[in-house]
Regions:
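Sec-dependent signal peptide recognition
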Residues: 2-8
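Edge beta-strand at a domain terminus
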Residues: 116-131
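Contiguous, well-ordered beta-strand patches that form the walls/edges
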Residues: 38-41, 52-114
Length: 131
């Protein structure tokens, strides 16, 4: 009887300790390669966007994002510094290589599939492939 009680408690703990992270981002989550500049990648997870230059020409950036329907809002960019604290960006100079012209900006999601994403705003047209 005591053994059965331990088994029930153990199974209960296992089932309650496992939690799956749910994301409402759909196809947006994952790694995207910019078509016009193959060394530039955008990576979406949760509410964080990581901008990375795989060729290491430009500084890596992290930003917050929200998605509301076909709108993608980007804000709060930080320059990634692995050796000390990340640094908040005051201007958009470091964002320009990633196709972003302001520290807070909004794109319209023109197309989003499991393999392709197209973003537009008044000044920029960005195309990505998922990998």
């Amino acid at each position: 009887m005591k053994r059965l009680l331990y088994i029930i408690i153990g199974v209960t703990l296992l089932l309650t300790s496992c939690d799956k992270e749910d994301s409402t981002n759909g196809h947006l989550d994952g790694f995207w390669q910019m078509s016009s500049s193959p060394g530039i990648t955008w990576a979406f997870q949760g509410h964080i966007l990581e901008l990375r230059d795989v060729k290491k020409v430009h500084q890596d950036i992290v930003m917050s994002f929200t998605r509301e329907g076909d709108k993608l809002k980007l804000s709060d960019p930080y320059r990634v510094d692995r050796d000390s604290d990340d640094v908040a960006l005051k201007d958009a100079d470091m964002l320009i290589p990633y196709g972003i012209s302001n520290t807070s900006t909004e794109f319209r999601i023109s197309e989003l599939t499991s393999s392709r994403m197209v973003l537009d705003n008044n000044t920029t047209h960005l195309e990505f492939r998922k990998f």
